[in-house]
UniProtKB/Swiss-Prot annotation:
Organism name: Methylorubrum extorquens (strain DSM 6343 / CIP 106787 / DM4) (Methylobacterium extorquens)
Name assigned to this protein: Methenyltetrahydromethanopterin cyclohydrolase
GO biological process: formaldehyde catabolic process; one-carbon metabolic process
Coiled-coil regions listed: none
InterPro entries, A to Z: METHMP_CycHdrlase
Length: 323
């Protein structure tokens, strides 16, 4: 149950999706195991994984409050297969669940493990200040976290998550896949709507006024090199991503939001992400945060029926990244 009685339980909605993923492990090319007391699902480290696994993992990340589909047509003509994300509750789905806001590191051992946790487990632990703004907590008895990682979480991380959620390790499922994998790259591109919501939050737009949202971005081909793989998934969104938000706001606020969301607002816009990353010597904190946004935004005011646009697609930069 959620502590906010007007909001659904993310884990109650995502739970059946997790169990379905586990049940279909063989056909999705996943490896399910028990490690350090928790259930783990390898979706792309030692397992081959699949695009379909990535699509379904993305829906788990959304806490069961969104749909993710692969469409045969998209905004970038030369890369037509597109990840399409829709949520009728994008604030809770994207910020309350999908956003990778929980830093998890092996603080007790020497494994060097580090990953950002996303998914409905965040809403049980509520270790992030964001949940005070959302006014949401999910009092679930089982939960799941998705990790962008090439290995299962060590015991210290499992125990940290168990302590924060108040659940026994056996009641937590960790789903993990590196960016270089089919599933990993797919679930990252499926964050196209989430980064728009994050930008709306960053610029101070009233989140309660965001009613619905749709996003799309080209399905990036995986790459065995981590930097190249990370670059491709980012470029899919930064230069090929498009979102439409439906807001209960007046025209001036809708127009301003459409202008504020896109990646074109960033001083770092204009080069493939791997090139930008190399330019700052691999220091994420030196990259302008405004870059992590979709290329184009459409914001529709349901009050007036008018729509406003900002940003632009850069298909040539998608091509430069993907080839």
């Amino acid at each position: 149950m959620s502590s906010n009685t007007s909001a659904p339980s993310l884990n109650a909605l995502a739970g059946p999706l997790v169990e379905s993923l586990v049940a279909d492990a063989a056909k999705l090319r996943l490896i399910v195991a028990q490690e350090n007391g928790a259930r783990t699902v390898d979706a792309g480290a030692n397992a081959r994984g699949s695009i379909e696994a990535g699509r379904r993992i993305a829906e788990i990340c959304l806490g069961g409050l969104g749909t993710v589909t692969i469409a045969p047509i998209g905004p970038v003509a030369s890369w037509p297969y597109t990840v399409v994300v829709h949520s009728a509750d994008p604030v809770l789905a994207c910020l309350g669940s999908q956003y990778a806001g929980w830093s998890l590191a092996d603080e007790d051992g020497d494994s060097g493990f580090f990953a950002l946790g996303s998914g409905p487990g965040r809403a049980v632990a509520v270790v992030e200040e964001l949940y005070k703004e959302l006014g949401y907590r999910d009092n679930a008895t089982t939960t799941a976290l998705v990790l962008e990682s090439g290995s299962a979480p060590p015991a210290s991380v499992v125990n940290k998550v168990a302590a924060a959620t108040g659940l026994a390790p056996e009641n937590v499922t960790f789903i993990y896949a590196p960016t270089q994998s089919l599933a990993g790259s797919t679930q990252v591109v499926a964050r196209v709507l989430e980064v728009a919501l994050h930008k709306a939050h960053t610029v101070g737009f009233d989140l309660h006024k965001i009613l619905d949202g749709i996003g799309s971005a080209p399905l990036s081909p995986p790459h065995p090199d981590f930097i190249q793989a990370m670059g491709r998934t980012n470029d899919a969104i930064i230069y090929g991503g498009r979102v439409q938000l439906f807001v209960d706001a007046d025209d001036a606020d809708a127009k301003q939001l459409a202008e504020q969301i896109p990646s074109t607002t960033s001083a770092d816009h204009g080069a493939p992400f791997a090139e930008i990353f190399s330019r700052v010597n691999g220091d994420f904190y030196k990259i302008d945060g405004a870059l992590f946004s979709p290329a184009e935004a459409i914001v529709t005011s349901v009050k007036t029926g008018k729509s406003f646009r900002g940003g632009r697609l850069e298909p040539q930069l998608v091509d430069a990244s993907f080839v």
